[in-house]
Amino acid sequence: MSAHSMLCERIAIAKELIKRAESLSRSRKGGIEGGAKLCSKLKAELKFLQKVEAGKVAIKESHLQSTNLTHLRAIVESAENLEEVVSVLHVFGYTDTFGEKQTLVVDVVANGGHTWVKAIGRKAEALHNIWLGRGQYGDKSIIEQAEDFLQASHQQPVQYSNPHIIFAFYNSVSSPMAEKLKEMGISVRGDIVAVNSLLDHPEELQPSESESDDEGPELLQVTRVDRENILASVAFPTEIKVDVCKRVNLDITTLITYVSALSYGGCHFIFKEKVLTEQAEQERKEQVLPQLEAFMKDKELFACESAVKDFQSILDTLGGPGERERAAMLIKRINVVPDQPSERALKLVASSKINSRSLTIFGTGDNLKAITMTANSGFVRAANNQGVKFSVFIHQPRALTESKEALATPLPKDCTTDSEH
């Protein structure tokens, strides 16, 4: 293929990938974190290729083969093949074995955060040679990168489980490398290829300094990897088993939302209080109770003493008879436990969003290794900003409104009907 044909092909690929990346970002409600970053990287690549086409930049033909497109394409294809993609090109912080702070870029975070994917576009020959110490100075082997992923994942639990790691190879991987990764507990996706016997002259295996990711024929003659001999083709696992956390900790906001008259059909009012009218409108658009019920199903329910005590106090002041009755039934289903906030929760610095009550409730859930259900997203964000990431299920808030209905204006029948369709 001539350099011009290759350039045209690369430009066409870049344009297609931009469309796919944009579509990917739109596929999830609220978008995919890092989606804009992925698109901008692809657009930068396209801009560079167009400059080459216009004659503004002169590059070697070999460099055309080794642009970032191969890696970016691998990221897009990985994201398209996985469920519940929450972010791409996500940067995680972790501490290495020497106690130094490091960062790690995870190409695709999927399955609601439970799966980390590294997408690899480099050819099996190059990867295998780096692993055997025949790479350029400073090249980090895939196995070394896998060790970094494992270390980082153990410091970033999702719902108290370490994320599952998949290395997705789009230009094959040698059988010994695939085996080593599996031994480490990392899943492999891609073609696993055979390795030929050792050559007689290992000194011939030293790569030249000008090698790109897409090696020329001279390297293929001396490499041990036989890409024609595919031993196995492994697809992404269709079902990645996740250890679902079966413990749920209920925050005061969730207890209130669960028993609120708004959640039981009392949302067809215009209340004196603007915030209640807004919540009623939200409820007519999207019912919150089915979401809570679905998440709580088949799980053990907990609440700390402080949460229950404050909930009862609010209920005694503002609750209507139906709300109190539902509250009594709900409390019977809950294991009420003493306040026992975790150590990391106690390290949080108080602020407008972080008060002692929230700290106690979320910290107790953390200590129980439970997912805290809450409408208090402000606390969750503030804690996250201080480096403490709690396992949470966030929902819309609903206040106690039954006692407010007498002074509220009922919505006309046609309004309530229209809003429900």
Swiss-Prot record:
Lineage: Eukaryota, Metazoa, Chordata, Craniata, Vertebrata
Superkingdom: Eukaryota
Protein family: Belongs to the UPF0415 family.
PANTHER family in the record: UNCHARACTERIZED DUF1308, UPF0415 PROTEIN C7ORF25
InterPro entries: DUF1308, DUF5614
Pfam families: DUF1308, DUF5614
Name of protein: UPF0415 protein C7orf25 homolog
Organism per entry: Bos taurus
